[in-house]
């Protein structure tokens, strides 16, 4: 991990060189697309049962190699059912959702559950919130010179725990982000695209079981010929062909449309 005051995203390498990444200049007024990544490190065994920390505010130290210990604070959003060691976390000052094995990764130190709780807020427009889920959108970001830059993406779901936030991903950078999209919509920075396909979803027979790839191991071939492995950890309810993938060598949660072919 890097500290928020470390290198800008444009100065860091990405695990997957085949994807266009977020430029350091693509910033919103309130926050910015900041990301940190790292290679997989050693793990430490869990010696005793752990308390449920989902929904808790946490802080911990992070030490990478011979570098200094940096301090991180954030909110635990979820514990992944197919890999209970893995937690999804929204760190303060960063827009990506990160996946970490908080109790097993030896680079995590002094993990502390904070007494402050996540404030529960009422959604300002429940109908609009429901309407935008599963929709393609154009999301405007303000650059350093004050101009607007447009990012096409898809709203995936309401985020857990932080109930005024939404999961979203982008064509340019298919990792999992979260924003308060209702505010952006009302400010004119988010536009819902017309449906490109108005046909209704295929009807299911009563009792029909739909195959899911959740829990499956995956292998991804990069443009340089190397391969990376990971696990499918979540299926998007609004778009069942879309899944979250956690690769073994990366903290980001990737979002891919895995259309099953025969």
UniProtKB/Swiss-Prot annotation:
Record localization: Nucleus
Region named Disordered: 1-49
Biased composition (Basic residues): 27-38
Tissue expression per record: Expressed predominantly in ovarian granulosa and thecal cell.
Primary location class: nucleus
Protein name (database record): Spindlin-W
Signal peptide: none
Name of the gene this protein is made from: SPINW
InterPro entries hit by this protein: SPIN/Ssty, SPIN/Ssty_sf
Family affiliation: Belongs to the SPIN/STSY family.
Function, as annotated: May play a role in mitosis.
Highest taxon of the lineage: Eukaryota
UniProt GO BP: gamete generation
Native source organism of the sequence: Gallus gallus (Chicken)
Protein keywords: Cell cycle, Nucleus
Gene Ontology cellular component annotations, sorted alphabetically: nucleolus; PML body
């Amino acid at each position: 991990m890097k500290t928020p005051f470390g290198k800008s995203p444009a100065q860091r390498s990405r695990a997957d060189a085949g994807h266009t990444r977020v430029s350091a200049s693509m910033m919103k007024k309130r926050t910015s697309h900041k990301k940190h990544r790292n290679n997989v490190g050693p793990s430490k065994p869990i010696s005793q049962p752990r308390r449920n920390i989902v929904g808790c505010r946490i802080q911990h130290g992070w030490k990478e190699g011979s570098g200094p210990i940096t301090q991180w604070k954030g909110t635990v959003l979820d514990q992944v059912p197919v890999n209970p060691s893995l937690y999804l976390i929204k760190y303060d000052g960063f827009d990506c959702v990160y996946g970490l094995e908080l109790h097993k990764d030896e680079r995590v130190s002094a993990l502390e559950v904070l007494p402050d709780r996540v404030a529960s807020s009422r959604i300002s427009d429940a109908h609009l919130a429901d309407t935008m889920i599963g929709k393609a959108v154009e999301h405007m970001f303000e650059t350093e010179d004050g101009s607007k830059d447009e990012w096409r993406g898809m709203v995936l779901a309401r985020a857990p725990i932080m109930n005024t936030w939404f999961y979203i991903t982008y064509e340019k950078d298919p990792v999992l982000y979260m924003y308060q999209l209702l505010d952006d919509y009302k400010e004119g920075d988010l536009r819902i695209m017309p449906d490109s396909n108005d046909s209704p979803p295929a009807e299911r027979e009563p009792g029909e079981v739909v195959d899911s790839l959740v829990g499956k191991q995956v292998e991804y071939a990069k443009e340089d010929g190397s391969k990376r492995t990971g696990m499918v950890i979540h299926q998007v309810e609004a778009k069942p062909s879309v899944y979250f993938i956690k690769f073994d060598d990366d903290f980001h949660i990737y979002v891919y449309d895995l259309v099953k072919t025969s």
